[in-house]
Amino acid sequence: MAEQTLSFVDCLTSRFPTVRVSVAQPRGEITLDVPAVEWCAVCRALRDEFDFEQLSDLCGVDYLGYGNTEWDTTDVSAQGFSRGVAGKAVGRFAWGEFPSAGSNDGTQPWDVPQERFAVLAHLISYRHNRRLRVRCFASNDALPIVASLTDVWPGVNWFEREAFDLFGIVFEGHPDLRRILTDYGFIGHPFRKDFPLTGNVEVRYDEEKKRVVYVPVTSVEPRVSVPRVIRDDARFGAAAGESTHSETVK
């Protein structure tokens, strides 16, 4: 890890003792996991004390099912996702079994969050040429609530509206929290992992009523998507092997 990154991590750990600081290898990406009660205070300190003057992006994340190597779906065979996982014994995992999650380097298990919904903010410090990812988990899965950052970075207004619209995360203190992508009569939040892939209703223009109407979904066939799989990317291993081979040849 670069000395500059280590120094910055030490500064963050010293300034925010209740915040978890993690560094993703090999790129040295730094992430702060901030408790919900300290979300605004920590972000304000990052802006004022660490010169993170710009918030480039904010999004919501639904961790439902995260860490499960595979899970039961409908209308697929037991061999349907065999390219994504490797069994620990002869044969495949039986449906309903949830093997332990993989790892990012083959030694440590992935950290599976206890809470379902999180908010991620990506910050930039132009003065120090530095980027930082800040994450906050909502404590209530049924009604996820996180404080709004509009008083810290006013430009986050529409980002928070998007996260509210797509994930149902409520940003407390937001001046105008309403849907931004879906229409006003939309029911549910389409980026949640338990939202049906076909949707609930479809919209069309009714010639007789001379207006847009909602009708049950009829034009989309049910389908099964490929599940999120946590595994090592073989491309990086192959690239490392080729690099070692080239040095040996030289």
Curated annotation (Swiss-Prot):
For this protein, the record's Pfam families field holds: Complex1_30kDa
* UniProt membrane topology term: Peripheral membrane protein
According to UniProt, the reaction catalysed is:
a quinone + NADH + 5 H(+)(in) = a quinol + NAD(+) + 4 H(+)(out)
The protein's UniProt keywords, in alphabetical order, are: Cell inner membrane, Cell membrane, Membrane, NAD, Quinone, Translocase, Transport, Ubiquinone
> What GO cellular component entries does it have?
plasma membrane
The reply to whether Cell inner membrane figures as a keyword in the UniProt entry is yes
Q: Which PROSITE patterns match?
A: COMPLEX1_30K
The family classification in the record reads: Belongs to the complex I 30 kDa subunit family.
* HAMAP family registered for this protein in UniProt: NDH1_NuoC (MF_01357)
Q: Which PANTHER family match?
A: NADH DEHYDROGENASE [UBIQUINONE] IRON-SULFUR PROTEIN 3, MITOCHONDRIAL, NADH DEHYDROGENASE UBIQUINONE IRON-SULFUR PROTEIN 3
Q: Which NCBIfam families match?
A: PRK06074.1-1 (NF004730), PRK06074.1-4 (NF004732)
Protein name in the entry: NADH-quinone oxidoreductase subunit C
Q: Which organism is it from?
A: Xylella fastidiosa (strain 9a5c)
